[in-house]
A protein has these predicted regions:
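GT-A fold catalytic core of metal-dependent nucleotide-sugar glycosyltransferases
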Residues: 78-127
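Conserved glycosyltransferase catalytic-site signature
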Residues: 76-83, 178-183
Length: 275
């Protein structure tokens, strides 16, 4: 059984997305308390977000001004920077999830780490992801990328060293749709890892207990309510976790300080009660 303390969930947030950081941590602390959580920000924490974080305990770090070459970032840039960040400390982990900050992650059986490591081991590669279907636009991966850090960064550090200054200089030329996910695939193709296995996507989904979201994509819920979530495979499986999560005193405290997101999550829970 993999050791949960050897798991790291890493994400990034620019100023408009800081509002999701406390919620990202709240749900991960419930789901996988021993796992490390790392949030990299482009600017300083807003005062209201800092106050929310004082309510949280657990194994997490929120790092301000984490990208010294930037004073601030736009959405495309911050999403690309998650693929273009390496620290030696990452190599202490057996598994690392690099994904979106606007996620409420729930505990699953088997756990998140086990699901993705099984996919890696099945294909003999150091990453678990899929190629989006052709109807989704330019060929690219998804924005939730799970890796075996030691092997992944051994192959990817030359790509990081190449593309991070190119990103800053505006020299990466890719179509706008899914820009950061195209960059991720481009880095894989150009690295020693090469072309992903032909059966990458078809083996990905059976490896998962529910979906690649492993919970609720809060931004989808903001945009479309429960209908916005119904496109995620296995979304019904999360009913017990979301119902329990919205009933805690800590959830009520966070909601009082972040009523928009708290209200959305409470509304989603009410919708789940009807399933």
């Amino acid at each position: 059984m993999p050791d949960e303390s050897k798991m790291c969930f890493m994400t990034v947030a620019n100023r408009p997305y800081q509002k999701y950081v406390p919620w990202f941590l709240y749900f991960l602390n419930r789901a996988y308390p021993k796992a490390h959580k790392l949030v990299l920000l482009d600017v300083a924490l807003a005062d209201n977000i800092r106050q929310m974080l004082t309510l949280l305990s657990g194994n997490f770090e929120v790092r301000e001004r984490a990208f010294p070459e930037y004073t601030h970032t736009d959405a495309n840039t911050i999403k690309c920077l998650r693929w273009l960040t390496f620290e030696p400390a990452f190599e202490q982990y057996d598994c690392m999830s690099i994904g979106d900050v606007d996620m409420a992650t729930y505990v699953e059986t088997p756990p998140y780490m086990d699901q993705h490591l099984a996919h890696c081991d099945q294909l003999g590669i150091p990453y678990s992801n899929f190629i989006r279907p052709p109807q989704a636009g330019p060929r690219r991966m998804s924005g939730i990328h799970v890796i075996k850090p030691r092997e992944w960064f051994a192959a990817m550090r030359p790509m990081i060293n190449k593309y991070r200054p190119m990103l800053k200089a505006g020299q990466i030329r890719l179509p706008e749709q899914g820009f950061n996910e195209q960059l991720l695939l481009h880095m894989v193709l150009e690295s020693s890892l090469g072309e992903p296995p032909a059966n990458l996507s078809e083996t990905y989904w059976p490896s998962l207990a529910t979906s690649n979201h492993h919970g609720t994509h809060i931004r989808l819920a903001e945009c479309g309510g429960i209908r916005g979530l119904q496109g995620a495979k296995g979304y019904r499986n999360h009913k017990p976790e979301i119902l329990a999560a919205v009933k805690t005193p800590l959830f009520r405290q966070l909601s009082a300080m972040s009523p928009q997101i708290g209200g959305i999550l409470a509304a989603i829970a009410r919708a789940y009660e009807n399933f």
